């Protein structure tokens, strides 16, 4: 594969991923709205375990989807930029941020090719993203490039289809993701 065709392949795959999430955006947004109503304290406790949140912390939310983490961290006084490759997810995120009276900067961007300057963010957070990536190593290189010296990365992720592959795992009630 030459470099040109490799780039075309990645763009095609990214577009397929974006199409998938565009189709699921409204339902996924409803789930996130419910989380904003019911689970904020749980998520803040988890985040505080790893990262000391303070006002004006510059945060990058990778694969922000409908904006759950972006909104949650904006409510804490952080300056949040949320990125996603799905136009519909970004529209849901903007709507949800407005409904929650917070300002967050949302941008369309590939997490594997970030357009931010080096050392732009104090904290990078991502949830349910890296397990989907074709080139996670490239994404991690980009994350570390945009993180400030002594910055923090919190990657909340898992293999969400493992229960389909391991029947003992499924029988033990691990298909609901609460144990992750």
Where are these regions (language model features)?
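Short, Lys/Arg-enriched N-terminal segments with co-localized hydrophobic residues
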Residues: 1-9
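Conserved class I S-adenosyl-L-methionine
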Residues: 10-54, 68-72, 92, 152-180
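Class I SAM-dependent methyltransferase SAM/SAH-binding core
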Residues: 60-62, 66-113
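A short acidic, Gly/Pro-enriched loop at the edge of an enzyme's catalytic core
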Residues: 112-123
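A short glycine-rich, Lys/Arg-flanked "PGG" loop and its adjoining helix->strand segment in the class I
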Residues: 137-152
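A short SAM/SAH-binding and catalytic strip from SAM-dependent methyltransferases
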Residues: 123-136
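Nucleotide donor/acceptor-binding cores
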Residues: 56-58
């Amino acid at each position: 594969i030459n470099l040109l065709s490799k780039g075309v392949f990645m763009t095609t795959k990214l577009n397929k991923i974006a199409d998938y999430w565009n189709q699921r955006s409204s339902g996924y947004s409803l789930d996130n709205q419910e989380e904003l109503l019911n689970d904020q304290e749980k998520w803040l406790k988890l985040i505080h375990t790893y990262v000391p949140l303070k006002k004006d912390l510059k945060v990058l939310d990778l694969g922000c989807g409908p904006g759950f983490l972006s909104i949650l961290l904006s409510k804490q006084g952080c300056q949040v930029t949320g990125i996603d490759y799905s136009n519909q997810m970004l529209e849901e995120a903007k709507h949800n941020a407005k409904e929650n009276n917070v300002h967050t900067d949302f941008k369309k961007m590939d997490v594997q090719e970030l357009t931010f300057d080096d050392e732009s963010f104090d904290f990078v957070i991502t949830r349910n993203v890296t397990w989907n990536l074709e080139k996670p190593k490239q994404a991690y290189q980009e994350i570390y490039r945009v993180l400030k010296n002594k910055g923090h990365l919190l990657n909340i992720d898992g293999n969400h289809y493992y229960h389909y592959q391991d029947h003992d795992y499924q029988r033990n009630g691990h298909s609901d993701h609460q144990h992750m």
